[in-house]
Regions:
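DNA-binding alpha-helical recognition surfaces that contact promoter or target DNA
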Residues: 19, 26, 101-102, 159
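Hydrophobic recognition helices of helix-based DNA-binding modules
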Residues: 24-31, 138, 161
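Conserved helix-loop functional segments at active or binding sites
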Residues: 5-8, 33, 69-77, 101, ...
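Conserved tyrosine-mediated DNA breakage-rejoining catalytic core shared by Y-recombinases
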Residues: 46-47, 92, 101-137
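Basic, Lys/Arg- and aromatic-enriched nucleic-acid-binding interface segment
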Residues: 14, 18-22, 37-96, 141, ...
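Short, Lys/Arg-enriched alpha-helical recognition elements, typified by the DNA-recognition helix
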Residues: 1-29
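Short, charged phosphate-coordinating catalytic segments
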Residues: 29-40, 89-109
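C-terminal catalytic core of Y-nucleophile DNA break-rejoin enzymes
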Residues: 53, 117-136, 142-169
């Protein structure tokens, strides 16, 4: 009944329903350990929720190089910064949110030290020649709050990346 309620009344998808069920099971386990109830039926309850596998979209190495080497038209130079930030994300495996928060003080000579936004993991990431070149390009340019790179809003960046992909025929 609870699953039907979440699906029909709250308009939740199966992945969200699965998370809600996980929260409920956690609470029921906690309350059982505290002797608030003696029912353990929840422990064996495994709803069959259909999920569609996520389609992973990625660039091949050739496509990444094509983007890196693409000559941006003179009237669209604003796309250069977007490309650089995107390529930095690719070459370091950092999420947009982590590059958005990357400060100059996080940049060391051969690596960067970051605490990720999503998982709060502390990481030390070795810089390859591509990521070093991007940081070097912007090292003398001042950005607000001592940021290392010229990161714009995620929505704008996605819009510009789409345009850049079309221009570069990727």
């Amino acid at each position: 009944e609870y699953i039907n309620f979440l699906r029909d009344k709250k308009d939740m998808r199966n992945s969200t329903i699965g998370k809600q069920m996980g929260f409920l099971k956690w609470f029921l386990r906690w309350s059982f350990k505290k002797d608030y109830h003696q029912n353990i039926a929840y422990d064996t309850f495994k709803p069959k929720l259909k999920t569609t596998p996520k389609k992973v979209i990625f660039l091949t190495w050739d496509e990444l190089n094509k983007l890196k080497d693409y000559q941006i038209p003179k009237d669209k130079q604003y796309l250069e910064r977007v490309r650089d930030v995107f390529l930095f994300c690719c070459f370091t495996s950092l999420r947009y949110s982590d590059v958005r928060n990357l400060k100059r003080s996080d940049v060391k000579s051969d690596h960067i030290e970051v605490t990720t936004v999503k998982t709060a993991d502390s990481l030390s990431i070795e810089l390859n020649k591509y990521s070093k070149a991007i940081l070097e390009k912007y090292k003398d340019i001042h950005f607000e709050n001592h940021m290392a790179l010229p990161v714009i809003s995620n929505q704008k960046m996605n819009d510009y990346l789409k345009a850049l992909g079309e221009l570069a025929e990727i």
